[in-house]
């Protein structure tokens, strides 16, 4: 946007308009009142730079919002003024007449009331002043601190602790010390001669130098105590380190009756005895004093300051965690990735799954699978216990041989065993070896078992050689079921003889070129009888392949023809022809499915049972069952001979 700075600048003419259009809550009442809509509209109509239509529309929206806010604020002010006017001119307030519009002076002026202060005072005797004062009077012991004066020598004071908090500190401000402090020195006082006996003071306790009075300080040269404390000469100030006491310094005798010299600070004052003579002058102790001033009371300075260390509690500060800046390594997608994403449409494409057109086909689709046919009964069982009883016998049992093979490691997995049991390949020789079925027993002029075995062996070889490989697994299962039905029910010999005549010569020549099956020598006479059977089987195999291809083509067309319309297939026709021959030859009115499926495997029995159901649906036979899981009896139906 080349006009972004013009529109979005904070001091631009359209800044508040743009803000009102996109962030209305950001505008305050002052911003709304300060905004000039006339200049803003003119700026929008004739902008300095060209703006897009969308931008001008946004700005017009901001103008409308600001105008709405202004109208709302004006309405609020009008309502407030109206309410105030209405409250001021209430119906209960009566207007004053024209001659009484000015209020009276007394009504608006406060009265001046001067109180009489010349009242007689009460008598002094009426108030017990002494009693009032004694209430707040305390004893001296309660309000006065005790003066604890001990024999503390200032010579040993190390200047630590409190000092100068008594009356001696107050004497610094007295004028009596003005001349004495500067004139006197410690050397002059110490070397001054002791006065004679005539000038000795009396034995009465005097307070001349007790630092509690200044009566005699004006005429004296100053006390030794005050000169020693307050003098800065000779290093004897109160703020200097006191000199150490050595043996060379002469100290006066301690008199027990001298109560005034409680500090025992200096050798000032002569002895009280009258016979005391003049004292010899003291030797020059300047060198000794300088030496003592440089010494300390503790011989080892390191030991004097060898204090125990104090535990330093360091306040733990929380370390500031450094923020880690996360930067995406891949900032943009390359063209290959974008092109691959655009070409990937797997998430929006699914397989087409159309529902069956009729409800019956929908029901067959739900329950017609192998997992439903082999686990559910023919009629719905709502009781769970009965359903468990039905499915209890449907679990495949693994034979001992397969178990031994499984333990020996010859098989891959148990699933392979179960698949072999559920979908075994149909052994044609085994089927023909057990020809003791009811249908086979009713066929007239049936050859011997040896001839049947030779015929079946040749037919198996031809079927395996001429059968094209199935394209799908579904076609393979259908073909295997049809071959089972074909092997289980053989057409009568009369039908074989009738179909022998119109055989094509090309088919016969093609079959003669096929490899011959080894037969026993005693069955060579029946070889001519095997050829028509082989030809018939060849035709049947071709027809079967053609039917299968037609069925697959119809399935590939999307199920245009309903499965119900294709009623007859080869298996049901063979089953119906077999039942018709049995009824015609034996005269039996019922056929047992259990006897028909004897010595058959699961797949063969299922194929026969399915054929029975198809025939029952077309009313060719009637099925009866006395109780669940019992034998099914088939009897000729109303359309048994019509179909």
Curated annotation (Swiss-Prot):
Ranges of compositional bias, category Basic and acidic residues: 537-547
SUPFAM superfamilies: Winged helix' DNA-binding domain
Skewed-composition ranges (Acidic residues): 548-563
InterPro entries linked to this entry: NXP1_M-like, Rad21/Rec8-like, Rad21/Rec8_C_eu, Rad21_Rec8_N, ScpA-like_C, WH_DNA-bd_sf
Keywords of the record: Activator, Apoptosis, Cell cycle, Cell division, Centromere, Chromosome, Chromosome partition, Cytoplasm, Cytoskeleton, Developmental protein, DNA damage, DNA repair, Mitosis, Nucleus, Phosphoprotein, Repressor, Transcription, Transcription regulation
PANTHER family xref list: DOUBLE-STRAND-BREAK REPAIR PROTEIN RAD21 HOMOLOG-RELATED, SCC1 / RAD21 FAMILY MEMBER
Family membership: Belongs to the rad21 family.
Entry protein name: Double-strand-break repair protein rad21 homolog A
Native species: Danio rerio
Gene name of the encoded protein: rad21a
């Amino acid at each position: 946007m080349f006009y972004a700075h013009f529109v979005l600048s904070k001091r631009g003419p359209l800044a508040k308009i743009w803000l009102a259009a996109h962030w209305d809550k950001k505008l305050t009442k002052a911003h709304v009142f300060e905004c000039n809509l006339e200049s803003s509209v003119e700026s929008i109509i004739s902008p300095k730079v060209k703006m897009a239509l969308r931008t001008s529309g946004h700005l017009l929206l901001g103008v409308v919002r600001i105008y709405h806010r202004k109208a709302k604020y004006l309405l609020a002010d009008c309502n407030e003024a109206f309410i105030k006017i209405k409250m001021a001119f209430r119906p209960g307030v009566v207007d004053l007449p024209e001659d009484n519009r000015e209020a009276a002076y007394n009504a608006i002026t406060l009265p001046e009331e001067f109180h009489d202060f010349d009242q007689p005072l009460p008598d002094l005797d009426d108030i017990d002043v002494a009693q009032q004062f004694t209430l707040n009077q305390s004893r001296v012991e309660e309000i006065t601190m005790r003066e604890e004066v001990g024999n503390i020598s200032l010579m040993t004071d190390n200047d630590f602790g409190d000092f100068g908090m008594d009356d001696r500190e107050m004497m610094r401000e007295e004028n009596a010390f003005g001349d004495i402090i500067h004139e006197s020195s410690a050397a002059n006082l110490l070397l001054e001669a002791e006065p004679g006996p005539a000038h000795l003071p009396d034995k009465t306790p005097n307070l001349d130098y007790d630092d509690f009075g200044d009566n005699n300080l004006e005429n004296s040269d100053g006390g030794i105590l005050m000169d020693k404390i307050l003098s800065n000469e000779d290093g004897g100030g109160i703020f200097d380190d006191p000199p150490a006491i050595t043996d060379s310094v002469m100290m006066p005798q301690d008199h027990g009756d001298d109560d005034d010299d409680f500090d025992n600070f200096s050798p000032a004052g002569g002895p009280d005895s009258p016979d005391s003579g003049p004292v010899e002058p003291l030797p020059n102790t300047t060198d000794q004093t300088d030496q003592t001033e440089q010494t300390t009371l503790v011989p080892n300075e390191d030991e004097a300051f060898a204090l125990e260390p104090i535990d330093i509690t360091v306040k733990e500060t929380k370390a500031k965690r450094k923020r880690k800046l996360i930067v995406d390594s891949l900032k943009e997608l390359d063209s290959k990735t974008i092109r691959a994403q655009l070409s990937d449409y797997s998430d929006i494409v699914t397989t087409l799954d159309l529902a069956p057109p009729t409800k019956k086909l929908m029901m067959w689709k739900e329950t017609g699978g192998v997992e439903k046919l082999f686990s559910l009964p023919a009629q719905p069982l709502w009781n769970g216990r009965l359903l468990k009883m039905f499915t209890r016998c449907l679990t495949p049992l693994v034979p001992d041989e397969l178990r031994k093979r499984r333990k020996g490691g010859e098989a891959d997995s148990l699933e392979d065993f179960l698949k072999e049991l559920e979908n075994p390949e149909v052994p044609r020789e085994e089927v023909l070896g057990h020809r003791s079925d009811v249908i086979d027993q009713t066929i007239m002029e049936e050859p011997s078992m040896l001839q049947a075995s030779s015929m079946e062996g040749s037919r198996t070889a031809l079927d395996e050689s001429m059968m094209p490989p199935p394209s799908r697994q579904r076609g393979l299962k259908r073909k295997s079921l049809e071959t089972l039905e074909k092997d289980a029910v053989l057409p009568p010999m009369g039908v074989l003889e009738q179909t022998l005549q119109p055989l094509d010569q090309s088919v016969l020549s093609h079959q003669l070129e096929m490899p011959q099956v080894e037969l026993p020598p005693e069955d060579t006479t029946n070889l001519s009888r095997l050829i028509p059977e082989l030809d018939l089987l060849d035709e049947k195999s071709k027809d079967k392949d053609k039917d299968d291809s037609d069925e697959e083509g119809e399935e590939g067309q999307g199920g245009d023809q309903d499965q119900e319309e294709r009623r007859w297939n080869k298996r049901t026709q063979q089953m119906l022809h077999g039942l018709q021959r049995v009824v015609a030859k034996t005269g039996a009115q019922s056929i047992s499915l259990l006897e028909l499926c004897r010595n058959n495997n699961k797949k063969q029995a299922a194929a026969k049972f399915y054929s029975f159901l198809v025939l029952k649906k077309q009313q060719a036979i009637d099925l009866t069952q006395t109780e669940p899981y019992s034998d099914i009896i088939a009897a000729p139906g109303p359309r048994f001979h019509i179909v």
